[in-house]
Every structure is written in structure tokens, then in C-alpha cells.
């Protein structure tokens, strides 16, 4: 009798432990993109209120390739900051956009310049927030998907022949961007952005 009681108790304990483990896994998955459909993930990206990123940018011109490492911080309508980490000769340069004025500063060079009423504040094609705005306003924006990622595409309405199409890749499981390609009018990738670190809606 005691053996049966102990066996029943052991089975109940194992079921409880199994239930707790399953519950924790389901909570973890619900916090990421595991239970989200494609449109929910796209809506999540399009409605970001803030983010911080560390990105590697490769820019291909007609003559050469240049590589930069940047930090970006987007605070909605308040302030956007972009800081150069590499190359070392321009490291420390910060571009701060408050929505009206553009401030360029570099403590190493004792540089502090403010450009008031800057017309092209929204034209930083390296910025995720610029992609989001372009995607929202362009009726040709669309997406593709596969098992691991969602690929968002939009056309850039610009006279700049080197920036005509933007393609953003989103990891399904984390709901975070992994890379972005910016193509010219001949479909050549001119700018390739790799998202090394991403914090969203801090």
C-alpha cells in the first residue's frame, strides 16, 4: 500500500515538474516571435517606439568599398543619435537629430556644430527608422517569408540613383532585424548593414 502511495506521489510530482517546464517554455516562446504570425511581426517592427543598435556598414561605390561600425539610438520623436565607432580616424563623431536641428559633435576634435531647420533630417538611409517610414508610405512595400525570416522590401522615392530599394531581414524567433540591403537603380547592393546588437523598445 505504501509503495503504491509513493509511486502515485512520484507520478504526481513528475507531472507537476513537467507542467512547470512546459509552462516556462511556452512563456519564453510567447515573449519572442515563436507564436507570432508574419503580419504581427511586421506590425511590431513598424511600430517601434525606441531602439539601440550596433551595426557594421559596408558601402560600395564605383571605385572602392568602405566599412564602418556605428552605434544608433532612436528615441521616437525626441532624439536620434548616430555615433561612429570605426574607423579610428573618425571615431567619436556623433550626429544628433532632434527632429528640427542637426547637431554634429566630436569631443576628440573639439567639434560642435548645429545646423538649424535642416531639411533632410529624414534622409539617413542607414537608419532603421528611415526604412520604417519608407515602408509605411510606399504602396509598393511588400514582404516575403521563409521558415526562419521575414524579408520586408520597399522602394525609395528619391533622386539618388544609389538608393532605390531597401530590403530588411527580420529573424522570426527574436523579431529583430539581422541585416539590411540598399540597392541602386540597377539592383546592385550599394549598402549592406549587419545588425550586430539590437535592443528594442527599451
Map each language-model feature to its residues.
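N-terminal leader/targeting segments and the immediate start of mature chains
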Residues: 2-76, 202
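Short, solvent-exposed coil/turn segments at beta-strand boundaries
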Residues: 47-52, 72-80, 96-101, 147, ...
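Beta-turn initiation residues at beta-strand->coil junctions
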Residues: 57-59, 84-87, 105-108, 156, ...
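Amphipathic hydrophobic-ligand
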Residues: 64-70, 91-97, 161-162, 188-191
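An acidic-aromatic
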Residues: 71-126
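A short, amphipathic edge element
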Residues: 130-142
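Gly/Pro-enriched, hydrophobic low-complexity segments
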Residues: 143-202
